[in-house]
UniProtKB/Swiss-Prot annotation:
InterPro entries: FAD/NAD-bd_sf, GIDA_C_N, MnmG, MnmG-rel, MnmG-rel_CS, MnmG_C, MnmG_C_subdom, MnmG_C_subdom_sf. SMART domains: GIDA_assoc_3. It is found in: Cytoplasm. FAD binds at residues 13-18. It comes from Shewanella piezotolerans (strain WP3 / JCM 13877). It comes from the Bacteria. NAD-binding protein involved in the addition of a carboxymethylaminomethyl (cmnm) group at the wobble position (U34) of certain tRNAs, forming tRNA-cmnm(5)s(2)U34. This is tRNA uridine 5-carboxymethylaminomethyl modification enzyme MnmG. Gene3D superfamilies: FAD/NAD(P)-binding domain, GidA associated domain, C-terminal subdomain, tRNA uridine 5-carboxymethylaminomethyl modification enzyme MnmG/GidA. GO terms for molecular function: flavin adenine dinucleotide binding.
Amino acid sequence: MHFHERFDVIVVGGGHAGTEAALASARMGSKTLLLTHNIDTLGQMSCNPAIGGIGKGHLVKEIDALGGAMAIATDYAGIQFRTLNSSKGPAVRATRAQADRALYRHKIQEILQHQPNLRIFQQAVDDLVVENETVVGVVTQMGLAFEAPAVVLTTGTFLSGKIHIGLENYSGGRAGDPPAIALAHRLQELPIRVGRLKTGTPPRIDANTIDFSKMTEQKGDDPLPVMSFIGDVNQHPEQVSCHITHTNERTHDIIRAGLDRSPMYSGVIEGIGPRYCPSIEDKINRFADKNSHQIFIEPEGLNTTEIYPNGISTSLPFDVQLNLVRSIKGMENAEIMRPGYAIEYDYFDPRDLKNSLETKTINGLFFAGQINGTTGYEEAGAQGLLAGMNASLQIQGKETWCPRRDQAYLGVLVDDLSTLGTKEPYRMFTSRAEYRLLLREDNADLRLTEKGRELGLVDDERWAKFSDKMESIETELQRLRSQWIHPRSPLVDVLNPHLKTPIAREATFEDLLRRPELDYPTLMSIDGFGPGIDDQRAAEQVQIQVKYSGYIQRQQDEIDKAIRHETTGLPLDLDYQEVPGLSNEVIAKMNEHKPETVGQASRISGMTPAAISILLVHLKKRGLLRKSA
C-alpha cells in the first residue's frame, strides 16, 4: 500500500537529530516527512535534563546560528543557566542549561507543528526500499510505503535495542518504547559496517524523599545567560537550584559487592560504553584510588518531583541501586521512581559516510546521531541539521556542504567520525578542535549565519537581527580605531586612574582597550569614551576581537597554510594500488577508509607527509586534482 503523496525528504526518528534534520530540510523548501513511532515523544530528552556544556554548548550555538531549534527550545525550557569556565578565556567558555523536560518537548513539538513544508506521521519504519544502490523510500510497520529520493535515518538507541537491569534484559529502544528490530535487520543487509555500543542512565529519585539540607546548593548564574542568538532572558521560566553530594566508601563497597550481578562485569553486555560518561560501576573500577565521586542532583522540571542524580548511571540490579542511593548523604531515605539501566544498540561505522553524512554505498541515504556512534543531544542535533540540509541540497541538484575543521565544531565532529571512525560513543570537547580560539561560542553566528542564509536555513527575522548586530560591531570597531587620545588631553586625567601605567604617547581607543587592565564596559563608562553599544553580545564581540586580535590573526595564518591541500578532493573510486610509491600499509588504509579529501587522508593513522606528496603527484599527473566543495 502506497501513501497518496510523494516527498522530497523522509526523516526517520523524532529525537534531537531527527527534529533538526526535518526542520532543516523543510526550511530549505523541501517537502519533508518526519516519521516517528510516537508523536507524543518528539523532542524527548531521553537521558539527562540538560543542554550544553564544554564543547557541547559550542555545537548548540552552531545549530542556532544555522537556524536550528535546540537553543530556542532551551531558552524556553531552561530552569537553570550557567557559564562554565567563566574565569578562563573565551575559547573554552561554555553555556549549560538545566531544562524542564516537559517544556522542552512542548517547545520542540510547537516548532515542528508550525514549520511549513513539514508533515508528521506516526508509524515505525521496518524497511528501506533500495533500487540500483539508491534509496527510493521506506515501508512502515503496517505496510504503508512512502516514496522519496532522500532518507535520513536518526534511529538513536532503537536499532536492536536491549535494556539491561542487573542480569535481566529485554528488548527496548529506551525505557517504555519498543526497539526497531526489523529495521536493524534490514540495515545489516547493506554494505555498511555495523557494531554495538552501550549507554546508560541513573535511577530517578523522588525529591520528596531527599534531604537537600545535607547537600551543597548550586545556584545558576546572575545575570542569566541565553542560549540562542535571538533569545531573550525574559523567555526563561522560573529558575531553580541544583545540589551537589558525593558517594563514599560505603557506596563503593555496595557497588563492588554487586558487581557479580552487573551485566557489564559478567559479560552479558558486549557493547562499549561512553568513556566520558561512565557508569558508577566503571568509575569505582577505573578510579579505585578515589574514595568519593561527585553527584549533581538535578531537577527534571518545575512540575515534577523527579530528580536526576547525575553521576550514578548504573545497570546494577534494583536492590543494589536502592542500597547505593541510600548510602549517599542526603538520600538516606530516598525512593527510586524509575530504575537506572544500560542499553545496547547497533551503530554503523561512520567511516562509511561522506562528510555530507550520506552513505558512500547507497545514494540518498543519510545517517545522523547515535547511529553514527556519537553520544549526546548536541552532537545528534548538529548531525541532524547537517544531514537534513544536505538531503535537501542533493534533491535540489546542488552541491552538498560541510564546514571545515577551522569553521565549526560541527566540522570537527564530522571529520573525526568520517575519517577516523569510533569504537566508543563519541562526544565533543573543545580539546578536539585545533583552532578553538576561532571556534568560540560567542562567534558561532559570525562564522555560520551568513552561510546558513545562503543555503536557505536562516529566516528573515534571524537574518535581520544578525545584520543589525554585525553593523553595530563594525561601526563600533571603526570608531575605536579612528578616535585618538593625546597625552595632554583632558581625558587623560580621567583615564589614568584606571591604568597601571599612565598614557605617555598618542593612542587610539582600540589601543586602550587592548590593555589587560581595561575592559569595554569600564572604558565606555569613562566620560569622553562612551557611550558605546547597548547590545551586550555585540559589545562582548567588540572586546574579544580587539583584545585577542593578535592571537586570532596568528591562528588564521596557520589555517591559511594548512588549508592549501585540505580541500583537495580524492575520487571515491580511486584504486590506491595503482598509485606508485605508496606502502602496502597506506594502500590498505586508503582503500579501507576511502577519504574524500587530502585533508581527511592526512589524518588517517599511519599516513605520512611523504605518502601525501606521492598522492598529490599522482593526482596531478592523472589530471585528477580538484577542490572539494
